[in-house]
């Protein structure tokens, strides 16, 4: 989309993350979320970033094989209010910036004309549908609980496989999840 985010700008932007709404436009005909919409006022608020978002930079390998660094935080999803909110985990995510807060300039970087942000604040974190590509390849809502369950399942499969392939060898594996 022609945007260039420096680490200095990212650090400033993250400070505006608390209380940012989780926004979405749900299309009941297609049973999925859509895009940003024609106007930013479309859709519903499906959640919020808490005051203390537990923010961290994390590396994730995207489906294209490239490892990228993403900003991750806790969010509260209003799943009891809206049935469709239960399908948010796994959906792509895009950030929306508050237009009057945006400052920056167009610059050529590596032969490409890009908008380099210097100031902005969050307006929302937008839930995207299956057919909508996010600005940042692997940006998505995920559940730590689901990730942890997957890790435990993988460890259990490893143990079963190990027991089958090495009846004579005994190995003790201790896990500590914290």
Feature locations, PLM:
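Signature of dsDNA virion morphogenesis modules
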Residues: 1-171, 175-176
């Amino acid at each position: 989309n022609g945007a260039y985010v420096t680490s200095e700008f990212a650090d400033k932007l993250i400070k505006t993350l608390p209380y940012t709404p989780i926004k979405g436009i749900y299309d009941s005909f297609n049973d999925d979320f859509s895009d940003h919409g024609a106007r930013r006022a479309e859709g519903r608020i499906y959640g919020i970033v808490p005051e203390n978002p537990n923010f961290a930079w994390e590396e994730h390998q995207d489906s294209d094989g490239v490892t990228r660094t993403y900003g991750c935080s806790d969010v509260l999803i209003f799943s009891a209010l809206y049935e469709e909110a239960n399908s948010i985990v796994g959906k792509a995510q895009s950030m929306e910036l508050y237009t009057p807060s945006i400052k920056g300039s167009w610059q050529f970087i590596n032969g490409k004309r890009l908008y380099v942000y210097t100031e902005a604040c969050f307006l929302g974190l937008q839930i995207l549908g299956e057919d909508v590509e996010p600005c940042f390849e692997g940006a998505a809502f995920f559940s730590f609980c689901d990730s942890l369950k997957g890790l435990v399942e993988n460890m259990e499969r490893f143990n079963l496989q190990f027991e089958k392939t090495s009846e004579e060898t005994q190995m003790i594996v201790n896990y500590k999840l914290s």
